[in-house]
UniProtKB/Swiss-Prot annotation:
This is DNA mismatch repair protein MutS. The keyword Signal does not apply. The lineage of its organism: Bacteria, Bacillati, Cyanobacteriota, Cyanophyceae, Synechococcales. Keywords: ATP-binding, DNA damage, DNA repair, DNA-binding, Nucleotide-binding. GO terms for biological process: mismatch repair. Belongs to the DNA mismatch repair MutS family. InterPro entries: DNA_mismatch_repair_MutS (IPR005748), DNA_mismatch_repair_MutS-lik_N (IPR007695), DNA_mismatch_repair_MutS/MSH (IPR017261), DNA_mismatch_repair_MutS_C (IPR000432), DNA_mismatch_repair_MutS_clamp (IPR007861), DNA_mismatch_repair_MutS_core (IPR007696), DNA_mismatch_repair_MutS_N (IPR016151), DNA_mismatch_repair_MutS_sf (IPR036187). ATP binds at residues 726-733. Residues 1-60 are annotated as: Disordered. It comes from Prochlorococcus marinus (strain NATL2A). Pfam families: MutS_I, MutS_II, MutS_III, MutS_IV, MutS_V. This protein is involved in the repair of mismatches in DNA. It is possible that it carries out the mismatch recognition step. This protein has a weak ATPase activity.
Length: 926
């Protein structure tokens, strides 16, 4: 009987692999399954395949694990670069090093049997980051042992996810054949996948409700070296979205990248020498410089989209954007190559991506990074949590597609009045049609992520369950189409792909449903994927397997009779195959021709020659079934992938419908109203911001036992600047944020929490709320505050919304007051943007006396007998007292400190009775 193969020596390294494979060639056919060998045959077998006794190596070459851990610090010793001679390595390790040289910046996972192994410096990295055992492996007689660490093949996704989260890129080297071809020493292996943070397709590695952006950026200095042009292209490989934009100024690019929060950013090698603008912000992956050249970029784009020229893209052939697009596609060609599709002998990516959409940097409401943090649009300012953000409050979507869509809307609100009103009207219709709204949401609730599912199918990485989910999603489209049988849905192009469902999709879903079982296995190579009756060859093989199973059942009964062992069972184990199991007490009664296979505590396991022969036949049939089912599945997956663009169009329509029904649900449940949006072309009214009884959309939902106090705002008609005064902790900052959030909600087309509203379109929203030291940059609180203020004053326009809170606190009283006063006048007289300036400097109330577009507002409080009550109501007029001492008392400051502060305040007021006054306006601000 053939000796079992040593899994380490036989499949991991070098010569033993070759010898075992040669032996295997000599044991084909019937000899391979002939387990009942005589003693003479066993001797002949041992002569053909001698087993070499393992002897210890030279003690000087053996490194124990403790020593290896100590030497892990000395990484250069274990780098593949420092090998004295690559030919001294075993064949498998030689191949590993060759692949590692091609992927020096990636962790190389090398498939060996049931594990992905890492060696040299990668093994040390893997061990540290994943906290797995670092072991060693013999690399050759002249080299000795080297570091080795590995992860199970079946758990590779989980471990790869951890590596990606830590910012690493991964190269997957998989086995390309089950066994070596004749004449080859090694199993054929090759790089099948490059996983980088921005090129992930695997479901478990992605956040369902966020886009995973891969970005490409290029900068180009003008001849005068003062103005920098830039282009930023971004793509989500999981959804196919492809957007490109251009701009000027490194600061603007910085804000765009902060807003984008890309998983990965690439650029041409050595093109960005000045790191000041992005250092500490992003990590840039350098890529082949020639891929970003204008000529090669054009060739890449034409090859990918099968175009004769690029004019149809609407991008100038000499623009920076052509280069960023071409570089991005080239990067995908490398990370996701489609080996089966070569055009002009060039490998194309198998990722299905849309045509690049040109984004006008002025087409949407601009919200800088500081404002995003201050308004807590997608995460809270304090701890970065989702709960408590605006998105948390208004996202009522039910699908992952819808969740990503509303995030995009809220991160980039539009200035398109027609688009806003269209969304508002659909929301209004759905608010009134509660039954329709509930039916649509019920249908959407179980909808899979068609965008990403179709992306995996297009890249030929989808599993059987992915295809079933795609079919289930498509099957819901006709029902949704019936729900959209209303005139209002015909007025928008959002839903064209649902209203006019492509017949090919229905046929595809039917084919998947008729062929793949309802709950298919995760593995694609072990069979059990398809129903009976879909392929005659598959049916014939399954018939053979049924015959073998019948024989197994009869064999169990027959062996019971022969052995008189009534509790005998014929069982199967993945490692041992088929065997006869009997209790320990009955083992002495087994027939002589039974061969003992395994002894357990309470059981003995045996095999018979006939059972082993039948097992070989069963394994052959199973292998043919698995191979055929995999071929059938790949054909079906390829067909599904060819429809990925059509599926994605339907998915985009579903995402819009999900967002709009969610916003309608929000409006209906929280008593929202439709704001009247004023077109920017209406000169007299375009800057109006009038909200009656507005409410903070987030705070209102957080309050459980209290009722939120609504407040009005009136800006843009006669008043451009509101000076808002009032005690500390009275709600001034909340009021500022409320106004900003309602403007953003209105410009995504949402209804808002208010009694009524008339709102003009804002081109930008700016906030300056609070500040902290930036220790990393060596900037004090006051300097941070001034930098933020300067940015606002240099970029705001008359159509902007500016929200300022307590400017001038970080310096002396007179300096702070002077700066606050001057900033207020600059906003009111020169920029004339719609602005609210919250302050504790009551002297600023005087500005309204000589500048007609300034008005004073205050937050009302009740103060009796040293007791302060916050009413949170904003009214016209200026406050004349800060009540800071009373706020300190409410905060829990010790009574002795509070009382002493009152005495000190009286003395200060007595000695400084004169108030600061400005008798005439500052002419320089005209």
């Amino acid at each position: 009987m053939a000796a079992s193969q040593n899994p380490i020596q036989g499949s991991l390294f070098g010569g033993n692999e070759e010898s075992d494979l040669n032996k295997a060639e000599k044991l084909k056919g019937s000899e391979r399954s002939n387990v009942n060998l005589s003693h003479q045959q066993l001797k002949e077998d041992a002569s053909l395949r001698p087993r070499i006794k393992q002897t210890p190596k030279n003690p000087n070459q053996i490194i124990d694990l403790d020593e290896l851990s100590r030497l892990a610090i000395e990484e250069p010793k274990w780098s593949h670069h420092n090998l004295p001679k690559i030919d001294d390595l075993t064949p498998a390790l030689r191949h590993y090093v060759e692949l590692k040289k091609e992927n020096p910046d990636r962790v190389l996972l090398y498939r060996l049997g049931d594990f992905f192994e890492c060696f040299f410096e990668d093994a040390i990295t893997l061990s540290k980051l994943l906290e797995i055992t670092l072991t060693s492996k013999e690399a050759g007689k002249k080299i000795g042992k080297i570091p080795m660490a590995g992860i199970p093949h079946h758990a590779s996704d989980r471990y790869c996810t951890e590596l990606i989260k830590k910012g690493l890129s991964i190269a997957i080297c998989d086995q390309l054949e089950a066994a070596p071809t004749k004449g080859n020493k090694l199993i054929k292996r090759g790089i099948t996948r490059l996983i980088t943070p921005g090129t992930i397709l695997e479901e478990g590695m992605l956040s369902a409700k966020k886009n995973n952006w891969l970005a490409s950026v290029l900068l180009e200095a003008k001849s005068n070296q003062e103005i920098i042009d830039w282009s930023l292209a971004k793509i989500d490989v999981s959804t196919g979205e492809f957007i490109v934009q251009e701009g000027q100024g490194s600061n603007n690019l910085r804000h765009e990248l902060i807003k984008l929060n890309a998983a990965e950013v690439i650029s041409e090698k050595k093109s960005i020498s000045n790191k000041i603008w992005y250092e500490g912000l992003i990590e840039i992956t350098e890529f082949n410089r020639t891929s970003f050249s204008n000529l090669e970029a054009i060739t890449t784009i034409k090859n990918h989209y099968c175009l004769n020229n690029i004019d149809s893209l609407g991008i100038h052939s000499n623009s920076l954007s052509i280069r960023t697009i071409g570089g991005l596609i080239s990067y995908l060609n490398k990370t996701h190559p489609n080996i089966d599709d070569k055009s002009n002998n060039e490998i194309k990516t198998n990722i299905c991506i849309d045509y690049p959409r040109i984004k006008n940097s002025r087409s949407g409401l601009i919200i800088d990074s500081q404002t995003r943090r201050n308004l807590e649009i997608t995460s809270t300012q304090k701890d970065g949590k989702f709960q408590g953000s605006l998105l948390w409050a208004i996202d009522k979507t039910l699908t992952a597609m819808g969740a990503r869509c509303i995030r995009r809307w809220i991160e980039e609100p539009t200035k398109d009045v027609n688009a806003i009103k269209n969304r508002q009207n659909i929301i209004g219709f759905l608010v009134k049609s509660s039954t329709l709204r509930k039916n649509i949401r019920k249908t959407l609730r179980a909808m899979g992520d068609l965008e990403r599912l179709s992306g995996r199918a297009g890249a030929q990485q989808a599993g059987a369950r992915d295809l079933v989910a795609i079919a289930e999603g498509i099957n819901r489209l006709p029902l949704i189409k019936n729900y959209l049988n209303e005139p209002i849905f015909d007025k928008t192009k959002y839903f064209d792909s649902i209203i006019n469902i492509d017949k090919d999709l229905i046929e595809l879903a039917s084919k998947i449903n008729n062929q793949i079982i309802d709950n298919p296995p995760l593995s694609l190579t072990e069979g059990g994927l398809f129903y009976d009756g879909i392929n005659p060859v598959l049916d014939g093989l399954r018939n053979q397997l049924d015959d073998h199973n019948i024989w197994l059942n009869s064999q169990e009964l027959e062996e019971r009779k022969k052995s008189n062992i009534n509790n005998l069972k014929l069982q199967y184990h993945r490692s041992f195959g088929y065997f006869l199991a009997v209790s320990k007490s009955k083992a002495i009664n087994v027939p002589d021709h039974w061969i003992r296979r395994q002894t357990l505590t309470n059981e003995e396991r045996f095999v018979t020659p006939g059972l082993k022969e039948r097992e070989g036949k069963i394994f052959q049939v199973r292998a043919r079934i698995s191979e055929l089912e995999y071929e059938l599945f790949c054909d079906l997956r390829k067909l599904t992938g060819s429809k990925s663009n059509i599926i994605r169009q339907a998915a985009k329509a579903i995402s819009h419908l999900d967002v709009l029904t969610g916003l309608a649900e929000l409006a209906a449940n929280h008593n929202y109203i439709q704001p009247q949006i004023i077109d920017m072309n209406e000169q007299d009214k375009s800057r109006k911001l009038s909200i009656i009884d507005g409410r903070h959309p987030v705070v209102e939902q957080i309050l459980v036992d209290k009722v939120f106090v609504p407040n009005d705002i009136e800006l843009g008609s006669k008043t451009d600047l509101i000076i808002l005064s009032g005690p500390n902790a009275s709600g001034k900052s909340c009021y500022l944020r409320q106004v900003g959030l309602l403007q953003i909600m209105a410009q995504i087309g949402s209804w808002i929490p208010a009694k009524s509203a008339h709102m003009g379109i804002a081109d930008q929203v700016f906030t300056r709320v609070g500040a902290v030291d930036d220790l990393a940059s060596g900037q004090s609180t006051f300097m941070v505050e001034m930098i933020e203020t300067a940015f606002i004053l240099n970029n705001a326009t008359e159509n902007s919304l500016v929200l300022l809170d307590e400017i001038g606190r970080g310096t002396s009283t007179f300096d702070g007051l002077s700066i606050a006063w001057s900033v207020s006048e600059f906003l009111a007289k020169k920029i004339k943007s719609r602005s609210i300036f919250a302050t504790h400097y009551h002297e600023l109330n005087q500005i309204s006396e000589y500048i007609e577009n300034v008005e004073n507002y205050k937050v009302v409080v009740e103060y009796k007998n040293h007791s302060l009550s916050f009413l949170h109501k904003v009214e016209r007029g200026g406050a004349n007292k800060s009540y800071g001492i009373e706020a300190a008392r409410l905060a829990g400051v010790p009574p002795d400190v509070v009382n002493n502060a009152r005495l000190i305040l009286k003395n200060l007021e007595k000695n400084n009775s004169n108030t600061i006054q400005i008798t005439k306006p500052i002419e320089s601000c005209k």
